């Protein structure tokens, strides 16, 4: 009977509590950025690969929403005109991707270039929205007429 009493003593309220930690992730775009610099043609699709990296551990068990967005605006007659933030005629938008800070895998955004898209210089912008803040980046792409 003595062993049972000692086993019960180990379960007393003075035992240490168990802590749980959750891994958080942050997103960046674009893993495939070097492939975005070639000339694009109407009818093609731009694929943006979002990647994740660990943002550390937390005891907070709540998942925090993150929205990943991408847009293409233009055309501009030149890179100088694009950088001057002049008016543009076209805005193409990828479907927003909704994830959380617990999403550990990469995701993909796609923007289809319409067949009637005018040639010129376009701004490809990416945005990460989380907890009321926004961060992002941009790159310049060129759309040229399709080759025969």
Predicted regions span which residues?
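Beta-strand-connecting loops/turns
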Residues: 43, 119-120
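Beta-strand-rich extracellular modules
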Residues: 127-131
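A short tyrosine-centered beta-strand micro-motif
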Residues: 122-126
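Contiguous segments within soluble domain cores/interaction surfaces
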Residues: 15-108
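C-terminal motif of bacterial Sec signal peptides marking the signal peptidase cleavage site
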Residues: 7-10
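Short, surface-exposed loop/turn segments at beta-strand-coil junctions that are enriched for proline
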Residues: 112-118
